[in-house]
């Protein structure tokens, strides 16, 4: 979970947080995730074939700029239990930014006594001094703690 990730970062870095920022993946990555997930559920795990199908689709052709995303996402999906995969397929695309903002803002405030900022990777005015947003993947947001 995101809270576990925050706790692990704090444990490793031993910093006392002043601000926590979470970056969610941009829209095309969510579409690509769902396409990769569908491929896996249909038995297709060949990265080359998956990349080819993503590039052929107008909504996910941006994968050309980040082919490593497919490998990481495929590994994410394959490491998850089958039931979770099926559940995510049923749900389809979600607004991670909205969900994280509504579910974690007060929790972070209570647990760490700091503000939580949530940005989409594609937000033009996002605060991202360490260029973390680009590493965000669906269900695997990037985290910056200052």
Regions found by a protein language model. Give the residues of each.
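Feature 926 captures the class I aminoacyl-tRNA synthetase adenylation module centered on the KMSKS loop
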Residues: 1-146
């Amino acid at each position: 979970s995101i809270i576990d990730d925050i706790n692990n970062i704090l444990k490793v870095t031993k910093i006392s947080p002043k601000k926590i920022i979470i970056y969610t993946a941009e829209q095309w990555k969510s579409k690509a995730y769902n396409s990769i997930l569908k491929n896996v559920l249909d038995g297709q795990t060949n990265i080359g074939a998956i990349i080819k199908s993503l590039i052929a689709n107008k909504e996910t052709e941006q994968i050309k700029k980040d082919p490593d995303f497919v490998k990481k996402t495929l590994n994410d999906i394959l490491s998850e239990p089958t039931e979770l995969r099926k559940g995510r397929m049923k749900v389809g695309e979600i607004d991670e930014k909205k969900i994280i903002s509504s579910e974690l803002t007060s929790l972070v405030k209570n647990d760490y006594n700091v503000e939580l900022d949530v940005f989409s990777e594609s937000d033009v005015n996002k605060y991202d001094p360490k260029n973390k947003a680009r590493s965000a993947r669906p269900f695997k947001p990037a985290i910056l703690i200052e």
